[in-house]
Amino acid sequence: MLEVAIDADGEWDSSRSWDGLVRRAAEAAIAESAFPQLATSGRAVEISVLLTGDAEVRDLNAEYRGKHQPTNVLSFPMAGPEDLRETNIAAPELLLGDIILARGVCEAEARDKDVSLEDHAAHLVVHGTLHLLGYDHHSEEDAADMEVREVRALQRLGIANPYEEAA
């Protein structure tokens, strides 16, 4: 059973409920991963998502990555591969980790890509969730695998391929 804990601060439009979008994006990413059972096994699985401003993300990016500027999404995995494979529903709750999105960066990127903030935020949650599941883009092969999984997850959400050039 997947639990997605969402905290959206004042930087994010409070008139929009981000809960459903974030949850669906995380579920889609898990479904397209090597660990789809995490969303359906009955085992308690949790992801925390913080929707915040650029300043907080800049500070976290500086502290944890040594980069003194905001980025669109940060992911902090907490589970190892052996934890992800565990299917016993009696196993302790699995904390996959934290995903943090920066409002200003997300908004600027969405505008540049000519997509809605909601679609871009969903893409970043998918991307962040895949990082929590051990995927990365350090090599071309890994990046290609991650991109395919992102595109398939976004298709589940009815969101166009963000890597495809507009005609």
Language-model segments: residues:
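Short active-site segment of divalent metal-dependent hydrolases/proteases
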Residues: 126, 130-131
